[in-house]
């Protein structure tokens, strides 16, 4: 009988403390994110059943460039308020509103912090997941390494129900990145 009471008390204490434990983990993630000025990483992206990979460079608060290893030599560039897909092979540039994407939220430390604080945190054996959704952008799930709190990827479900998975590997923090790297190519 005493053993059952002990287990019951432990279970109650554990579940009462779980929200504060998760809040503490969110703060550790935010602290890690706020210490990042630049990132360089390899990625694997899966969208529309197509797997793509490449390398990305991120410089806060305004810049992101992902270079895809594909035949079109595609580049995704976020440069302040512009979101551009550039096909180097064809010298074609396509502009999109960055306001309808989560990139602006990831690049801005305060906005990213708010996504983390307002999102629902869950964990498994290896990663923390933070799920956040909004009416005008859809849903995003961020993945963070459980050991070092590094961003390890995200999954987006857009307003049309399309899934995009983005996995990060070989993450390097706070390297010098020249702003020229994020220039939008001029069309000839």
Spell out what each predicted region is:
Residues 1-8:
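Bacterial N-terminal signal peptides that target proteins for export
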Residues 9-17:
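Bacterial N-terminal signal peptides
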Residues 21-23:
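Boundary at the C-terminal end of the N-terminal hydrophobic targeting segment
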Residues 31-51:
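A short, Trp-centered hydrophobic/proline-enriched beta-strand micro-motif
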Residues 43, 64-68, 83-86, 130, ...:
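Short hydrophobic/aromatic-rich beta-strand segments that constitute the beta-sheet cores
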Residues 56-105, 164:
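An acidic-aromatic
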Residues 89-127:
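Flexible, surface-exposed loop/linker segments and immediately adjacent secondary-structure boundaries
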Residues 114-188:
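Gly/Pro-enriched, hydrophobic low-complexity segments
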């Amino acid at each position: 009988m005493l053993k059952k009471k002990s287990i019951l008390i432990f279970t109650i204490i554990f579940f009462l403390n779980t929200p504060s434990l998760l809040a503490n983990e969110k703060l550790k993630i935010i602290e890690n994110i706020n210490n990042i000025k630049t990132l360089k990483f390899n990625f694997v992206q899966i969208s529309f059943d197509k797997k793509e990979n490449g390398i990305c460079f991120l410089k806060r608060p305004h810049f992101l460039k992902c270079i895809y290893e594909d035949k079109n030599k595609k580049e995704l560039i976020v440069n302040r308020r512009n979101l551009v897909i550039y096909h180097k092979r064809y010298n074609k540039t396509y502009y999109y509103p960055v306001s309808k994407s989560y990139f602006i939220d990831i690049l801005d430390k305060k906005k990213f912090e708010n996504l983390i604080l307002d999102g629902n945190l869950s964990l498994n054996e290896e990663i923390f997941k933070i799920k956040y959704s909004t009416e005008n952008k859809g849903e995003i799930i961020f993945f963070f390494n459980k050991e070092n709190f590094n961003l390890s990827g995200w999954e987006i479900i857009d307003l049309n129900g399309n899934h995009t998975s983005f996995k990060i590997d070989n993450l390097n923090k706070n390297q010098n990145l020249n702003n020229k790297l994020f220039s939008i190519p001029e069309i000839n």
